[in-house]
């Protein structure tokens, strides 16, 4: 309930309002959660779990925050465990765990649509569709859900189109532009 009451653009930004949690915005779509006072743009300190599954990118060996996470429409609850949790979650949980639980299609079927517009030409939309099927006796036998998200924005704009000159001179000792 504390996250829902925060004046933030999305639930992920709302986590930063919780005690002991810092959020670093590496870009518009990539947020890094840090706990225990270790603030860094590298998200290697916290373990992120979605429905009991580690959300690490195999090639990078760290979670990409909500860049590859669940849609905001599909989140049922988020638990943040601060501190070392290696005894329960393994060696990657030395600085805390972010555990997200998504909505069960058996419990919450239906259609949800969300549109967001904002500065930096932000356009974001999400769609969640879930349906359950019952047998002749009225018992639930199968359910599925589909989540689609799209975000488009200008994170930054390159306005210096001049060629880079890497020559070393007295007014440019490092050879940088």
Segments predicted by a language model, with ranges:
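A general structural signal for stabilizing positions within well-ordered secondary structure
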Residues: 12-15, 69, 88, 136
């Amino acid at each position: 309930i504390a996250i829902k009451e925060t004046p933030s653009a999305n639930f992920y930004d709302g986590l930063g309002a919780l005690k002991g949690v810092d959020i670093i915005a590496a870009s518009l779509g990539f947020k890094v959660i840090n706990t225990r006072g270790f603030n860094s743009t590298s998200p290697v300190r916290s373990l992120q779990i979605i429905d009991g599954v580690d959300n690490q990118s195999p090639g990078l060996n760290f979670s990409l925050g909500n860049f590859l996470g669940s849609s905001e429409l599909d989140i049922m609850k988020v638990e943040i465990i601060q501190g070392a949790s290696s005894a329960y979650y393994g060696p990657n949980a030395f600085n805390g765990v972010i555990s997200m639980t998504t909505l069960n299609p058996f419990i919450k079927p239906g259609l949800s649509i969300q549109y967001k517009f904002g500065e930096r030409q932000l356009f974001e939309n999400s769609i969640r569709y879930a349906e359950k099927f019952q047998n002749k006796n009225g018992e639930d036998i199968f359910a599925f859900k589909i989540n689609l998200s799209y975000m488009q924005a200008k994170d930054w704009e390159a306005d210096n189109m001049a060629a880079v000159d890497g020559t070393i001179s007295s007014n440019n000792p490092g050879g940088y532009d």
